[in-house]
């Protein structure tokens, strides 16, 4: 039997067990910043490794890249970020609190159990709706707001010692543009033929008006993006391919199918350059939220950078000699969001019997921070247990834990998602076998020490 999960419980567990801490906590923190602790950094790194393995390492089409965070500012003129990367901002006239107009409207619908997206609404449409429905300020319940205005989301800074418009640069708001400007370099040096993709993992920055919901929406975040280039006319077929591939990646990592949905964008929501966009959304305790945006960006980006740079970003077919600007399919995934989703999805509270219950993170073993924990039955077996730890930790992330009773150690490792607990007992001295406990079933079996590496390799396969 399991009980309902809440963000409060998950946030509390994440802090108490060392997954996620508030940023700069000893100085009172900094709003909406989070630090990944010892277990959190392992979990997030495992998520990134799993993405890289399937999207880059095991793909015959794709190669990797690590582009700079700081780019020539003309990049952002070409991409449209300087002119059009903004959110609709409004202030409460009474308490001066600041809000995104579209989110106020979406929250209004959510209270009535409706799921409505207002992307594509004009400022006038949003203002009219807020007036008509008498939507109030969430902070003070006042009904008077300023006019809606657009607020650019890019963080601005300066390069060098002078601070004027000539030295103005930006922290990148997405990793994608670093891929587009390197299209020619990568295609030539990797000797890639269409279709092929370029993927990268990296930090991006957006000066969000209303960040929130823990690590779901932050101003500093990490993306895992693939730009997949194909021949015009083949784009919708590849769009379907990558949409299904992304969903399968989540399910293969043990995310529950009931926890996700694919939502196609309406015509009103679609960007002007997009042929199609589908979001893979996850059901968080606070509602459905986007994990993955999969977009058919057509040839918009390469054409824009060709126009602004003067460099022809085209492809010439080596067989037919046909020249064209490739279309691009972009699966863009937030590393922080999907890490949070795996944490939420894995969290369970189980009532084992009338007197006993437990919290358990049923993470896929490939994602679990520790693949196993070595537990000596008593501290008298510490020396031999540490030898086993050293042997296994050469290949796996292993914890060594000798504090408290075996039962308490089991529960501790259930809470942090360790799939296997390996107990070194006095029988081990005689038969060279250990007791391996399965996190999910709590069943135990004896396994020879010489077979442990193969056992773990088989269990954590992805």
From Swiss-Prot:
<feature type="binding site">
    <location>
        <position position="174"/>
    </location>
    <ligand>
        <name>substrate</name>
    </ligand>
</feature>
<comment type="similarity">
    <text>Belongs to the class-II aminoacyl-tRNA synthetase family.</text>
</comment>
<feature type="binding site">
    <location>
        <begin position="330"/>
        <end position="334"/>
    </location>
    <ligand>
        <name>substrate</name>
    </ligand>
</feature>
<feature type="binding site">
    <location>
        <begin position="206"/>
        <end position="208"/>
    </location>
    <ligand>
        <name>ATP</name>
    </ligand>
</feature>
<dbReference type="Pfam" id="PF00587">
    <property type="entry name" value="tRNA-synt_2b"/>
</dbReference>
<comment type="function">
    <text>Catalyzes the attachment of glycine to tRNA(Gly).</text>
</comment>
<feature type="binding site">
    <location>
        <position position="100"/>
    </location>
    <ligand>
        <name>substrate</name>
    </ligand>
</feature>
<dbReference type="GO" id="GO:0016740">
    <property type="term" value="F:transferase activity"/>
</dbReference>
<comment type="subunit">
    <text>Homodimer.</text>
</comment>
<dbReference type="Pfam" id="PF03129">
    <property type="entry name" value="HGTP_anticodon"/>
</dbReference>
<feature type="binding site">
    <location>
        <begin position="216"/>
        <end position="221"/>
    </location>
    <ligand>
        <name>ATP</name>
    </ligand>
</feature>
<dbReference type="GO" id="GO:0005737">
    <property type="term" value="C:cytoplasm"/>
</dbReference>
<dbReference type="GO" id="GO:0006426">
    <property type="term" value="P:glycyl-tRNA aminoacylation"/>
</dbReference>
<feature type="binding site">
    <location>
        <begin position="290"/>
        <end position="291"/>
    </location>
    <ligand>
        <name>ATP</name>
    </ligand>
</feature>
<dbReference type="InterPro" id="IPR027031">
    <property type="entry name" value="Gly-tRNA_synthase/POLG2"/>
</dbReference>
<dbReference type="InterPro" id="IPR006195">
    <property type="entry name" value="aa-tRNA-synth_II"/>
</dbReference>
<dbReference type="InterPro" id="IPR022961">
    <property type="entry name" value="Gly_tRNA_ligase_bac"/>
</dbReference>
<keyword id="KW-0067">ATP-binding</keyword>
<dbReference type="InterPro" id="IPR036621">
    <property type="entry name" value="Anticodon-bd_dom_sf"/>
</dbReference>
<feature type="binding site">
    <location>
        <begin position="334"/>
        <end position="337"/>
    </location>
    <ligand>
        <name>ATP</name>
    </ligand>
</feature>
<dbReference type="GO" id="GO:0004820">
    <property type="term" value="F:glycine-tRNA ligase activity"/>
</dbReference>
<dbReference type="GO" id="GO:0046983">
    <property type="term" value="F:protein dimerization activity"/>
</dbReference>
<keyword id="KW-0648">Protein biosynthesis</keyword>
<dbReference type="InterPro" id="IPR004154">
    <property type="entry name" value="Anticodon-bd"/>
</dbReference>
<dbReference type="InterPro" id="IPR002315">
    <property type="entry name" value="tRNA-synt_gly"/>
</dbReference>
<keyword id="KW-0030">Aminoacyl-tRNA synthetase</keyword>
<keyword id="KW-0963">Cytoplasm</keyword>
<protein>
    <recommendedName>
        <fullName>Glycine--tRNA ligase</fullName>
        <ecNumber>6.1.1.14</ecNumber>
    </recommendedName>
</protein>
<dbReference type="InterPro" id="IPR002314">
    <property type="entry name" value="aa-tRNA-synt_IIb"/>
</dbReference>
<keyword id="KW-0436">Ligase</keyword>
<dbReference type="InterPro" id="IPR045864">
    <property type="entry name" value="aa-tRNA-synth_II/BPL/LPL"/>
</dbReference>
<dbReference type="GO" id="GO:0140096">
    <property type="term" value="F:catalytic activity, acting on a protein"/>
</dbReference>
<dbReference type="GO" id="GO:0005524">
    <property type="term" value="F:ATP binding"/>
</dbReference>
<feature type="binding site">
    <location>
        <begin position="221"/>
        <end position="225"/>
    </location>
    <ligand>
        <name>substrate</name>
    </ligand>
</feature>
<dbReference type="InterPro" id="IPR033731">
    <property type="entry name" value="GlyRS-like_core"/>
</dbReference>
<keyword id="KW-0547">Nucleotide-binding</keyword>
């Amino acid at each position: 039997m399991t009980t309902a999960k809440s963000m409060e419980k998950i946030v509390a567990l994440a802090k108490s067990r060392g997954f996620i801490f508030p940023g700069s906590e000893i100085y009172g923190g900094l709003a909406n910043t989070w630090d990944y602790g010892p277990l959190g950094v392992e979990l997030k790194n495992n998520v990134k490794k799993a993405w890289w393995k399937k999207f880059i390492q095991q793909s015959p089409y794709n190669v990797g890249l690590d582009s700079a965070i700081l780019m020539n500012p003309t990049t952002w003129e070409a991409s449209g970020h300087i002119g059009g990367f903004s959110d609709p901002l409004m202030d409460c006239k009474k308490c001066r609190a600041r809000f995104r107009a579209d989110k106020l409207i979406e929250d209004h619908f959510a209270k009535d159990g409706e799921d409505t997206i207002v992307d594509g609404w004009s400022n006038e449409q949003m203002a009219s709706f807020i007036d008509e429905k008498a939507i109030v300020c969430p902070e003070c319940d006042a009904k008077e707001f300023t006019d809606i205005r657009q607020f650019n989301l890019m963080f601005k800074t300066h390069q060098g010692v002078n601070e004027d418009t000539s030295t103005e640069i930006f922290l990148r708001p997405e990793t994608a543009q670093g891929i587009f400007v390197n299209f020619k370099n990568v295609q030539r040096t990797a000797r890639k033929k269409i279709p092929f993709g370029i993927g990268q993992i990296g930090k991006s920055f957006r000066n969000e008006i209303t960040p929130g919901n823990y690590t779901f929406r932050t101003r500093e975040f990490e993306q895992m993006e693939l730009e997949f280039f194909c021949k015009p006319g083949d784009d919708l077929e590849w769009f379907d391919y990558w949409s299904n591939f992304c969903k399968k990646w989540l399910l293969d990592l043990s995310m529950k199918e009931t926890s996700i949905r694919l939502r196609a964008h309406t015509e009103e929501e679609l960007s002007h350059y997009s042929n199609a966009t589908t979001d893979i959304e996850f059901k968080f305790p606070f509602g459905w939220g986007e994990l993955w945006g999969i977009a058919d960006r057509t040839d918009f980006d390469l054409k824009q950078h060709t126009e602004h740079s003067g460099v022809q970003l085209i492809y010439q077919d080596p067989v037919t000699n046909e020249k064209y600007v490739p279309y691009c399919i972009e699966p863009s995934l937030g590393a922080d969001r999907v890490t949070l989703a795996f944490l939420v999805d894995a969290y369970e509270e189980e009532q084992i019997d009338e007197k006993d219950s437990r919290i358990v993170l049923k993470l896929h073993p490939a994602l679990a921070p520790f693949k196993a924990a070595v537990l000596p039955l008593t501290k008298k077996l510490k020396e031999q247990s540490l030898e086993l730890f050293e042997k296994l930790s050469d290949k796996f992330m292993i914890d060594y834990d000798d504090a408290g009773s075996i039962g308490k150690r089991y529960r501790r490792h259930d809470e942090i998602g360790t799939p296997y607990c390996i107990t070194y007992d006095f029988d081990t001295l005689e038969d060279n076998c250990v007791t391996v406990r399965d996190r999910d079933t709590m069943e135990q079996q004896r396994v020879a020490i010489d077979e442990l590496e193969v056992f773990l390799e088989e269990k954590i396969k992805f």
